[in-house]
Design a protein with these regions (language model features):
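Rhodanese-like catalytic fold shared by cysteine-dependent sulfurtransferases
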Residues: 1-66, 70-153
Length: 153
C-alpha cells in the first residue's frame, strides 16, 4: 500500500489519480497537513539517494550497479540502459523476488523522467535494499546525453 503526503487535499487527490494511471492503485490514505504536520509531531523524515546520468554511466564503467527500469514495457523495448532489468512500477512489489536483485548491492532505478523511479526506489528501500538511488531525469536525461542504450531482444 501507498500513503500520500500532501499539503492540501486537492494535491493528494491529484497524486492518487496520477498513481492510478501508472498502475499503483493501492493508495491507503494521505497524511493531513503534509510534511509540516509530520515534522511538528517530531517524526523522522527519510530521504533517498539520487544520481545523475553522468555519474551512473561512470559507475557502470567501474564498480557497477544493477539497473532497474520501471517504465512501460513498450518504452523499455524501444531502448534502455544496457543490462537493465525491467518491471513496471505498478507491479514492483509483487515481482520483487523475481528480479534477482541483491539487497546489499547498489541498485539504480530509472523511468521516463524520475517520478516513477522515485516511488520505485522508495519501495525498494522499504523492502530492505540498502544502496538504492533514483536516476534524476530518468531515461529522458540519459538519452539527451547520448549515453549507451540497447533495445530488448
Amino acid at each position: 500500500p501507498v500513503w500520500l503526503v500532501a499539503d492540501d487535499p486537492q494535491a493528494a487527490l491529484d497524486a492518487r489519480l496520477a498513481l492510478a494511471r501508472i498502475g499503483l492503485d493501492r493508495v491507503e490514505g494521505a497524511l493531513a497537513g503534509g510534511f509540516p504536520a509530520w515534522r511538528n509531531a517530531g517524526r523522522e523524515v527519510a530521504t533517498l539517494a539520487t544520481t545523475t546520468p553522468r555519474k551512473l554511466a561512470e559507475r557502470l564503467k567501474g564498480e557497477g550497479a544493477a539497473i532497474l527500469d520501471v517504465r512501460e514495457e513498450s518504452a523499455f523495448q524501444e531502448g534502455h540502459i544496457p543490462g537493465a532489468r525491467h518491471v513496471h512500477a505498478g507491479r514492483l512489489e509483487e515481482k520483487l523476488d523475481d528480479l534477482g536483485l541483491d539487497r546489499d548491492e547498489p541498485v539504480a532505478v530509472t523511468c521516463s523522467v524520475g517520478h516513477r523511479g522515485g516511488l520505485a526506489a522508495s519501495l525498494l528501500a522499504r523492502a530492505g535494499y540498502t544502496q538504492v538511488s533514483n536516476l534524476l531525469g530518468g531515461m529522458t536525461a540519459w538519452n539527451k546525453l547520448d549515453l549507451p542504450t540497447e533495445k530488448a531482444a
